[in-house]
Amino acid sequence: MTRSSDTPSSSRASLSYKDAGVDIDAGNALVERIKGVAKRTSRPEVMGGLGGFGALCQLPTGYREPVLVSGTDGVGTKLRLAMDLARHDTIGIDLVAMCVNDLVVAGAEPLFFLDYYATGKLDVDIAADVVTGIGEGCAQAGCALIGGETAEMPGMYAGSDYDLAGFCVGVVEKSEILDGSRVAEGDVLLGLASSGPHSNGYSLIRKIIERGQADLEQEIDGIPLRDALLAPTRIYVKSLLSLIKESDVTVHALSHITGGGLLENVPRVLPDTLAARIDAASWTRPAVFDWLQREGNVDEHEMHRVLNCGIGMVVVVPAAQAERAQAALEAAGETVHRLGEIVPRQDEEEQVRLENVR
């Protein structure tokens, strides 16, 4: 009888999952390494620790009509730059920031965060550095790291290259949701300074570096260019929640300045009948953006359409409360610029009038 090709044979070596490229022991070792990270971010509402099939979290007390707010995001190709420069310790902060800064725009308090880490070959040290950064981001935002997924997928990624995604859930009182409906003519726009490009525009940034063979050790405004480009995204959650919940300022809207810059993100929180008049001379653009524009010969409009240009969050408040809002935000550690005001929109004009551009 002829043996079929799929019949087991004692002459063949016994295969294991590790032979196929998946190291279960490495995954278990990572879980043990990061348990302390998760524990340090815990909130009273969290039930249980890492390792369960699902993570449990109660709603906080004190809400009459709690509304859950969710968000998911990644860090784009900033991740590629971080891997190329072997800087894995802060990219997790970026991941958290991109999610929680979106949640706080609705007025929501972030409750918990989960991450997804996918790689071709799990390097426990690299993964632990990344998750430690995620824990730091959660601590800055006041939310709990309650779970995640580590996927080792040989053949899907080159070597120890990895990809990241984050998922966050927050809560807001139904009557206090910020949705832009309160924005009115005469409101003032306050801009909160960014820490750098944050996590957007990195395909353009990497192209500029590649084309010019840039020396990433050169100093820009007193720090190496590599550090300026990889500065973690600023997390605005605590300062904004303090303004919303603990001050006498009525916040009308918030806008997280991500991909699309001021030109595309501010309109997302404006009624169709209103526009934002922003004075581009009201803040000094950080040196890293000037370097990018010069080295890439990037058009001014493109700069404001792709990069945050030094403004990471916009706060819209009544004109009579603008000074109090600015003082409160500065007391919370933010650098604040008075960008402009809300004006009537003329016909179908663009909703951001950027004046005094270079």
UniProtKB/Swiss-Prot annotation:
| Highest taxon of the lineage | Bacteria
Name the keywords, alphabetized: ATP-binding, Cytoplasm, Ligase, Nucleotide-binding, Purine biosynthesis
GO terms classed as biological process? 'de novo' IMP biosynthetic process; adenine biosynthetic process
What EC number(s) does its UniProt record assign? Answer: 6.3.3.1
What are its GO cellular component terms?
cytosol
The entry assigns this protein to a family as follows: Belongs to the AIR synthase family.
Q: Which PANTHER family match?
A: TRIFUNCTIONAL PURINE BIOSYNTHETIC PROTEIN ADENOSINE-3, TRIFUNCTIONAL PURINE BIOSYNTHETIC PROTEIN ADENOSINE-3-RELATED
* Name the UniProt record assigns to this protein: Phosphoribosylformylglycinamidine cyclo-ligase
